[in-house]
Amino acid sequence: MSNLRFRCLVDSDFCDIAPFEPYIEKGSSDMGLALIAFDESELDTIKSLLNETQLEGSDGYLYILSQGSIEKKGKMPNSITKAYRYYKRYKKKQNRAAAHIERELSHSGDGIKKVCGGRFSAYKYTDQENKICFPFRFRASEDKNKPLFVLLHGAGAMGSDNLKQLFDNLPLYKQLIKTDCNILLPQAPFGSNRGEAMQNYIKSIKRLVDELPADFDRKRIYIIGTSFGGCCVWQLVYLFPEYFAAAVPVMGGLCLDRDYEKYDIGRLVKTPIWAAHSSDDTNVKIDSDDYYAAELKKLGADIKYTRWDKYGHTMSGKFYRTEKWAEWCLSKKLR
């Protein structure tokens, strides 16, 4: 790596850009994004500022910086420039979504508003405290005191059409419809899979469940999520122990930056968890699930872990079709 020069992308959603000011390429700082460039001799300084990122070397190769070490990958010229353009488009969508939420909050009261009926009735939820509003679908059971399943979609279904989350969760509610349980399907606003927006969305999910007018068994609330939704499930179980009767995070993770010490693992022991992941998942790394599954087993927690070595970031469909996750959830109940 002698005499190499590196470039990488920094994002204000994940780190403070100010310390990188001396390295920012001219004209590349926009909407909380910046391209930085530095020599190999400055690599130690960058390591102290960034925990994990991708670097593009002047030799045309991609390098992975992770926890202070650097690993050379394949030849990928202009990969950082392409990433910068992609995330600029992403930020524009995120800003439009934030502006829409701000407009909605300015003339909407707190709580649930029904938009239309049907098998999966459409609603809008406004949470002034967490400064967020989003649509959701709800299927009420014909019988009282039935369990509630909360299904959280992946990042690809974010938006405001109140439809994408239905298709994203299709393998789940195909299994659940025959149980005649209550089913809740929120749709996360675009851009709520990172930073403060993600935390606001996560907290508002719990508030929405609290405010649902349906007559369901509050000792049997089950939460299931895929990818981004799986990450939300881990966070909800951590933030609200002894609230959910069981949780199924699939292809998610509680601590993707691997700074495990910042979480009190004892909070996770209080909820039965069935995690599922594939070791070849390159979208959401398996490390966090590996760590917490092992640690929770040591503590004697009610933890199941399905760990596959193929299917990558598409393993959720097969998991939902072939594993008895619904029956497992229904066997759990809060005391």
Which residue stretches match the model-derived regions?
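A domain-start/cap signature at the N-terminus of enzymes
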Residues: 85-148, 181, 236, 292-293, ...
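Solvent-exposed alpha-helical segments and adjacent loops
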Residues: 32-105
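Gly/Ser-rich "nucleophile elbow"/oxyanion-hole loop immediately N-terminal to the catalytic nucleophile
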Residues: 193-227
